[in-house]
Amino acid sequence: MAGHSKWANIQHRKNAQDAKRGKLFTKLIKEITVAARMGGSDLNSNPRLRLAVDKALDANMTKDTVERAIKRGAGELEGVNYEEIRYEGYGPGGVAIMVDTMTDNRNRTVAEVRHAFTKCGGNLGTDGSVAYLFEKQGVLSYPAGSDEDRIMEVALEAGAEDVAVGDDGSIEVITNPDDYEAVRAAMTEAGLKPEHNEVTMRAGTAAPVDVESAPSLLKLLDMLDDLDDVQNVYTNADFPDEVMQALEA
């Protein structure tokens, strides 16, 4: 599975923990607010907002909270104006890292991001230093044991770019971002609702991480992901099974 990283699986577990302490809601509200501000409050004409709202509802956010966030973004209610900033850099072992943030204070945010990189042996780079390594994709994930033939049939007919099967039997449907909503709707309508789905940035080529670099790299990714202003962390790091086993030993 090209570009598949165990960091993605780690993030999914972290998201569950974040949800328990309310941090996930904060991220989702920011995304809804900014999406509504940039593209308007109509879900039918604003795919970014529709995706953000779907994610919020999937996380059991109340419709009232969602509606207030949309109104704040559309200027119908007072609220904080967030600015989107992407930071790029290199982590231990030379792996590429992109950090998407939403902030009301860019000086605070860049200081916190730079501190995390420096503390963990990485380097904050310039705009464009690693972005070329990543591609925006829609991803729908299914657990091992799912009906591979049926998923492949429906996905490709709906316009998916690829269907990839992992070594563990898990399945990923890859789409162009513009086709993501249509593919997801077709899969759900066919009774094939994904276990996890998102529009994300995927590296074209993975960078294997050795056992020496792995602890400090994971610490850096965790530090970045835990920052209040950080929405998403992307990396081309690939943690081989033997490295993860060594870390868990």
UniProtKB/Swiss-Prot annotation:
This is Probable transcriptional regulatory protein Tgr7_2237. The keyword Transcription applies. Keywords: Cytoplasm, DNA-binding, Transcription, Transcription regulation. GO terms for biological process: regulation of DNA-templated transcription. One of its GO terms (molecular function) is DNA binding. It is found in: Cytoplasm. GO terms for cellular component: cytosol. It holds the Pfam family TACO1_YebC_N. Its main location: cytoplasm. Gene3D superfamilies: 1.10.10.200, 3.30.70.980. InterPro entries: Integrase-like_N, TACO1_YebC-like_2nd/3rd_dom, TACO1_YebC_N, Transcrip_reg_TACO1-like, Transcrip_reg_TACO1-like_dom3, YebC-like. It comes from Thioalkalivibrio sulfidiphilus (strain HL-EbGR7). Belongs to the TACO1 family.
